[in-house]
Amino acid sequence: TRRSSDLVKLQGTEKSVSTVGGEMFHASAVIIATGASWRKLNVEGEAEYIGRGVAFCPHCDGPFYQGKHVAVIGGGNSGIEAAIDLAGICRKVTVFEFADTLKADQVLQEKARSLPNVEIFTSSQTIKVDGNGEKVTSIRIKDRLTGEERDFPLDGIFVQIGLAANSAPFRNKLETTPTGEIKIDAFCRTTLP
């Protein structure tokens, strides 16, 4: 099995990219458009219930939770916007933010707090996603100030803790930021000629 980093050769005037199937492409330039993936919580039960109660796109999956109770993990702009959007669909939306304060813009925080079916908890660490083998049934949250753990019964969880760059095949070949984004200049060029 070849590693993804073995599929790319960017040195010299001719660049090459090969597919997992062995097909090879050669060019004088390569456009890298690998995008990003949703960051995951990496807690017990999350992977097991992705698509069965753990979701990442409130616009895509929100309608499946009409009239139900959901959690949004993340108190940045994406998380609070998701909570506001889901509040129009769901019976109840509970937001859990790891930090002591929300990071979302103040106007979004005010809107979310004004909604009667949105509840917000800060200093909240997600410990575990629980389910019945078919779907999510609850989430375990640890209060980071008191150490107390509590199970919240609910129907769905929307993870909104940011995106991770899909740049793994290029990380040893191009200069990247500490979070994995490929560094470019004002003309979208990498540091390689």
Task: For the regions a language model picked out, list residue spans one by one.
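FAD-site-proximal beta/loop scaffold in flavoenzymes
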Residues: 37, 42, 48-64, 159-193
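Glycine-rich Rossmann-fold phosphate-binding loop(s) that bind the pyrophosphate
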Residues: 74-76
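N-terminal Rossmann-fold NAD(P) dinucleotide-binding loop
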Residues: 79-80
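Single conserved hydrophobic/aromatic residue that forms the stacking wall/gate
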Residues: 1-3
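A Rossmann-like FAD-binding core segment of flavoenzymes
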Residues: 5-19, 24-27, 32, 88-186
